[in-house]
């Protein structure tokens, strides 16, 4: 096993101005995970519990990120009861939150108008009691449990077609490893829109659990 850092990002479609260039990612705090297994460019990761700020946005995959980011960025940049700034973390994450589709359904089955969950992981050291309360009632704080996640990392564009291609590959990997998919796929972006496409860090993650052998 080896340790690494990363944000779950339950997505994202982003983003107005993260302030992250190609070389800035590692300077930003990320949520913590341990790599349990690695096969080629696939990883099985165990994420530690954490707190996220989340907002639900209704719309198409390619459109919801900007709105979600604006709400969450407003919160961490002082739109809260303490008027307190909170350090930026990475990545921003996005996943389906549609009530019409089972949790194991792929994003490719989502329809326009579905709900998407956009999240920022909160920096280590905060608790639910010490984080400032959001002024925007569309932003809520939630405790995220630790999770086992299958992951694939890639560079390139943020288009839906490429995301679905990587998601499909990750599902094949999970099946080959005897893993049961237990939640929605998550799209994580680590860079600002102005970062050159070939320097971007993108990830698709899927919650999984090991299948008990009879």
Labelled PLM ranges:
Residues 2-214:
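A solvent-exposed interaction/effector surface
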């Amino acid at each position: 096993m080896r340790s690494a850092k990363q944000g779950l990002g339950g997505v994202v479609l982003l983003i107005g101005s993260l302030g992250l260039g190609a070389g800035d990612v590692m300077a930003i705090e990320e949520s913590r995970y341990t790599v349990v297994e690695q096969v080629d460019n696939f990883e099985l990761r165990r994420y530690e519990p954490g707190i996220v700020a989340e907002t639900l946005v209704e719309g198409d995959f390619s459109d919801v990120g900007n709105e979600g980011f604006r709400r969450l960025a407003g919160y961490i940049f002082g739109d809260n009861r303490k008027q307190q700034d909170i350090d930026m973390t990475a990545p921003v994450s996005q996943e389906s939150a549609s009530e019409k589709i089972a949790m194991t359904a792929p994003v490719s089955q989502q329809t326009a108008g579905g709900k998407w969950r956009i999240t920022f992981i909160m920096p280590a050291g905060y608790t639910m009691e010490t984080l400032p309360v959001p002024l925007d009632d569309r932003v809520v704080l939630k405790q995220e449990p630790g999770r086992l996640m299958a992951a694939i990392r890639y560079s390139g564009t943020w288009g839906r077609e490429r995301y679905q291609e990587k998601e499909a590959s990750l599902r094949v990997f999970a099946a080959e490893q005897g893993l049961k998919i237990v939640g929605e796929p998550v799209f994580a972006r680590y860079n600002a829109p102005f970062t050159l496409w070939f320097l971007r860090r993108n990830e698709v993650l899927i919650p999984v659990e090991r299948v008990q052998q009879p």
